[in-house]
């Protein structure tokens, strides 16, 4: 009987933890887990372990949390594990060539896009923002470039008009977890045929920033509606009204025209705001110190605050 692959898993957030759970459920031999150092979180700024570390500890898997993998001592520690394969999912540290070369079968990565489209840090949100009709997960053999390695397996899923960054994230985490298990089995059996990426088709999913979440009402309503969905649950689009920050959790295309940012209509159905082209109906908002509410609930108690003729973003 062939020996099971000795797998080292490297990942940090919940997206990665779901991949680790799938490998454990499939009975894979995880000899160690690499994850980012514990970070301060919450109001008390207590050091919190990553979701991947929490899962590894539950399963008594050794956890390593180096600040960098460029350090010869950290590389020696990894080499001592004698891994056949390293599975990397949203780890957050760059793997130098010396690390990529250590496992017998190299390192594979689960990336939340249909490569070569949306290489980089925020593929889920950028796909929604751009109006893509589908997304997916690509499992690839890692190389030194950013998400440039040969593709081993792809799984796709349609992007619906209701999808948010959060809903698509959750779906891709599930798809990716199954895909990684399938890829590991195929690698062990030697049945995978790597497909080289066409660099001419590559696009880059730049990291999200809070500055991008400030709504520019001169943009077309169609673009802003996609941005609001893409940036939910983080960083959440926002604007200002009456000197207060207004977080916009949900919106849909509305009717009407006017100066960008002008409130055209307010009703329990939504707050209709003019854009550079068309209008948006804001349906779920959050005021400072409050929680997200359907606009109907806000309208009942603060009708005068959302009067037509007022302008957002000033």
Swiss-Prot record:
Any single GO CC term annotated in Swiss-Prot or TrEMBL for this entry: cytosol
Gene3D superfamilies named in the record: Formyl transferase, C-terminal domain (3.10.25.10), Formyl transferase, N-terminal domain (3.40.50.170)
Pfam families to which the protein is assigned, alphabetical: Formyl_trans_C, Formyl_trans_N
Source organism superkingdom: Bacteria
Classification via InterPro entries: Fmt (IPR005794), Formyl_trans_C (IPR005793), Formyl_trans_C_sf (IPR037022), Formyl_transf_N (IPR002376), Formyl_transf_N_sf (IPR036477), Formyl_transferase-like_C_sf (IPR011034), GART_AS (IPR001555), Met-tRNA-FMT_C (IPR044135)
Keyword annotations: Protein biosynthesis, Transferase
Catalytic activity: L-methionyl-tRNA(fMet) + (6R)-10-formyltetrahydrofolate = N-formyl-L-methionyl-tRNA(fMet) + (6S)-5,6,7,8-tetrahydrofolate + H(+)
Keyword Transferase in record: yes
SUPFAM superfamilies referenced in this protein's UniProt entry, alphabetically: FMT C-terminal domain-like (SSF50486), Formyltransferase (SSF53328)
EC number per UniProt: 2.1.2.9
GO function terms (MF aspect): methionyl-tRNA formyltransferase activity
Transmembrane helix in keyword set: no
Residues where (6S)-5,6,7,8-tetrahydrofolate binds: 113-116
Family per similarity comment: Belongs to the Fmt family.
Entry-linked PANTHER family: METHIONYL-TRNA FORMYLTRANSFERASE, METHIONYL-TRNA FORMYLTRANSFERASE, MITOCHONDRIAL
The protein's role, per its UniProt record: Attaches a formyl group to the free amino group of methionyl-tRNA(fMet). The formyl group appears to play a dual role in the initiator identity of N-formylmethionyl-tRNA by promoting its recognition by IF2 and preventing the misappropriation of this tRNA by the elongation apparatus.
Protein name: Methionyl-tRNA formyltransferase
Organism: Stutzerimonas stutzeri (strain A1501)
Gene name tied to this protein: fmt
């Amino acid at each position: 009987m062939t020996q099971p692959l000795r797998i080292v898993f490297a990942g940090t957030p919940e997206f990665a933890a779901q991949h680790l759970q799938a490998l454990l459920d499939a009975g894979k031999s995880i000899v160690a887990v690499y994850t980012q150092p514990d970070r301060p979180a919450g109001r008390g700024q207590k050091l919190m372990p990553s979701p991947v570390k929490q899962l590894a500890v539950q399963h008594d898997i050794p956890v390593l949390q180096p600040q960098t993998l460029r350090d010869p001592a950290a590389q020696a520690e990894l080499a001592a594990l004698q891994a056949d394969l390293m599975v990397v999912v949203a780890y957050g540290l760059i793997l130098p060539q010396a690390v990529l070369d250590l496992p017998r079968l190299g390192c594979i990565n689960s990336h939340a896009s249909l490569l070569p489209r949306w290489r980089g840090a925020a593929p889920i949100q950028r796909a929604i923002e751009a109006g893509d009709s589908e997304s997916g997960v690509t499992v690839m053999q890692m190389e030194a470039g950013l998400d440039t390695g040969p593709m081993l397996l792809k799984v796709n899923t349609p992007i619906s008009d209701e999808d948010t960054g959060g809903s698509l994230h959750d779906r891709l985490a599930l798809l990716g977890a199954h895909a990684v298990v399938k890829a590991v089995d195929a690698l062990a059996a030697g049945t995978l045929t790597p497909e080289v990426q066409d660099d001419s088709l590559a696009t880059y999913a730049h990291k999200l920033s809070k500055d991008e979440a400030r709504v520019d009402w001169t943009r077309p309503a169609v673009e802003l509606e996609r941005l609001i969905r893409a940036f939910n649950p983080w960083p959440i689009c926002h604007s200002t009204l009456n000197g207060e920050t207004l977080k916009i959790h949900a919106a849909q295309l509305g009717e009407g025209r006017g100066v960008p940012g002008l409130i055209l209509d307010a009703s329990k159905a939504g707050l209709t705001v003019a854009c550079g082209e068309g209008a948006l109906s804001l349906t779920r908002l959050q005021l400072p110190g409050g929680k997200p509410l359907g606009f109907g609930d806000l309208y009942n108690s603060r009708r005068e605050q959302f009067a037509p003729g007022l302008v957002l973003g000033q």
